């Protein structure tokens, strides 16, 4: 069984293996396919039209399946690798070990945002940005520039306390747990972290930055925490809702799974705590 660990507790060898698996997926072109998929759904998901990966109830099950597919790709390179998660409510500093040269590298330089250290820096030659929104072919970050503070644990707890999963109009204007976690309403959790990291993370091609996977692994963990706190609160909508994915409706692009099939993460992996 795969165990997803807090990135702050990873050993040097676990970090090395995770980075090596990322670099191998990048080298073979498999990594960029995930970036392409994510960007296509960002562009296609709209408040008043069909929406699957974002701005909708299926934000959480869609990303759970997306991360599962990516984790399986990593494990096809190295079976020992699991997706770590980044608890940004606790690990809040630009000086965190997450941003060290032996792991993800740090923030970008002021001139153009280019990440200058670590295995994903352009100077290392192993991480060209091929699926992009502009002409820049290097990984960019601007930690803490777009918004100064990451969400706090108190803000996380305020969202976890919400007892209703989602509600009409089932988009970025909805009340409920999903939309507050996604960050369109209230204290702004998920979206704020993308903006805090900056660079490609603040765009539809956000998976270009490997921290995307650690961020979304934590979002997934928060969904699991919410489920434990509210065992009688179901995924909504249950059925008959236009433009969004109901409980037993198949999700694109896979068309072989439903939100109902993804409610129990323990069939696939557990978390360290």
UniProtKB/Swiss-Prot annotation:
<dbReference type="GO" id="GO:0046872">
    <property type="term" value="F:metal ion binding"/>
</dbReference>
<dbReference type="InterPro" id="IPR002227">
    <property type="entry name" value="Tyrosinase_Cu-bd"/>
</dbReference>
<dbReference type="GO" id="GO:0042438">
    <property type="term" value="P:melanin biosynthetic process"/>
</dbReference>
<feature type="binding site">
    <location>
        <position position="63"/>
    </location>
    <ligand>
        <name>Cu cation A</name>
    </ligand>
</feature>
<comment type="similarity">
    <text>Belongs to the tyrosinase family.</text>
</comment>
<keyword id="KW-0186">Copper</keyword>
<dbReference type="GO" id="GO:0004503">
    <property type="term" value="F:tyrosinase activity"/>
</dbReference>
<dbReference type="InterPro" id="IPR008922">
    <property type="entry name" value="Di-copper_centre_dom_sf"/>
</dbReference>
<comment type="function">
    <text>This is a copper-containing oxidase that functions in the formation of pigments such as melanins and other polyphenolic compounds.</text>
</comment>
<dbReference type="Pfam" id="PF00264">
    <property type="entry name" value="Tyrosinase"/>
</dbReference>
<keyword id="KW-0470">Melanin biosynthesis</keyword>
<keyword id="KW-0503">Monooxygenase</keyword>
<feature type="binding site">
    <location>
        <position position="38"/>
    </location>
    <ligand>
        <name>Cu cation A</name>
    </ligand>
</feature>
<dbReference type="InterPro" id="IPR050316">
    <property type="entry name" value="Tyrosinase/Hemocyanin"/>
</dbReference>
<feature type="binding site">
    <location>
        <position position="54"/>
    </location>
    <ligand>
        <name>Cu cation A</name>
    </ligand>
</feature>
<keyword id="KW-0479">Metal-binding</keyword>
<protein>
    <recommendedName>
        <fullName>Tyrosinase</fullName>
        <ecNumber>1.14.18.1</ecNumber>
    </recommendedName>
</protein>
<feature type="binding site">
    <location>
        <position position="190"/>
    </location>
    <ligand>
        <name>Cu cation B</name>
    </ligand>
</feature>
<feature type="binding site">
    <location>
        <position position="194"/>
    </location>
    <ligand>
        <name>Cu cation B</name>
    </ligand>
</feature>
<feature type="binding site">
    <location>
        <position position="216"/>
    </location>
    <ligand>
        <name>Cu cation B</name>
    </ligand>
</feature>
<keyword id="KW-0560">Oxidoreductase</keyword>
């Amino acid at each position: 069984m795969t165990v997803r660990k807090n990135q702050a507790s990873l050993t040097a060898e676990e970090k090395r293996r995770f980075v090596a698996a990322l670099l191998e997926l990048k080298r073979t072109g498999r990594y960029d396919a995930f970036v392409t998929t994510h960007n296509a759904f960002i562009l296609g998901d709209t408040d008043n039209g069909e929406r699957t990966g974002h701005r909708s109830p299926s934000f959480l099950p869609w990303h759970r399946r997306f991360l599962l597919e990516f984790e399986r790709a990593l494990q096809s390179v190295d079976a020992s690798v699991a997706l770590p998660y980044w608890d940004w409510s606790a690990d809040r500093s630009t000086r965190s070990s997450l941003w060290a040269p032996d792991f993800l590298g740090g923030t970008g330089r002021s001139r153009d945002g280019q990440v200058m250290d670590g295995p994903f820096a352009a100077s290392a030659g192993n991480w060209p940005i091929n699926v992009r929104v502009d002409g820049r072919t290097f990984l960019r970050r601007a930690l803490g520039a777009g918004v100064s503070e990451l969400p706090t644990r108190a803000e996380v707890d305020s969202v976890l306390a919400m007892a209703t999963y989602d509600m009409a109009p089932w988009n970025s204007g909805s009340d409920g747990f999903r939309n507050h976690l996604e960050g369109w309403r209230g204290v702004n959790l998920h979206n704020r972290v993308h903006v805090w990291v900056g660079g490609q993370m603040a765009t539809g091609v956000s998976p270009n930055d490997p921290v995307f996977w650690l961020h979304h692994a934590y979002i997934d963990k928060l969904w699991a925490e919410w489920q434990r706190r509210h065992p009688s609160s179901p995924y909504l909508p249950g059925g008959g809702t236009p433009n969004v994915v109901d409980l037993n409706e198949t999700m694109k692009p896979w068309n072989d799974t439903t939100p109902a099939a993804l409610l129990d993460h323990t069939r696939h992996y557990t978390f360290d705590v």
